Amino acid sequence: ILAEVGRGGMSIVYLARDKRLNKQWAVKEIKNDGKKSAKTLLKGLEREANILKNVDHPVLPRIVDIINQDGTIYVVMDYIEGDTIQDRLKKEGAQPQELVVEWGLQLASALNYLHNMNPPVIYRDMKPSNVMIKPEGGVKLIDFGTAKEYEIENNADTTALGTRGYAAPEQFGDSKGRGIY
């Protein structure tokens, strides 16, 4: 472990280096917060890992290992250097149109790739804090905790997931009587 690089409500992300391969990885440490059982938490992580272990797209990260040790879960994944779009907007404000269009094209390509997987994967938490801008200018879509494989037999998923303000209004019951139609 080289350094702490991020912290969220339930997790800490570290930068680590594999000495044998001389490769940097991100290691997400997730402790059971008492609100969710470790079993439920592990199931969600396994779902995320199973989705990401099968991807091969430049905008999508890879998960290489999940370790469950004494109630703490460690997820080893690609280390993505850079800022999130949210961080960039806070620091610099509005970005040039050409750059934003390029980011949009890259993200659309990643979503198209996910939707064409078998089974299709639905990414359900698109927001500026879940898109990393790499130093060379490309983007990476992160945080697949709410992503889901589409089940054709179960198209009546009523689970509200995502982030208020970024998710569809009907996810949080905010759309009744609103809209232009």
Feature annotation, model-predicted:
Residues 157-170:
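Conserved activation segment of eukaryotic-like protein kinases, specifically the C-terminal portion
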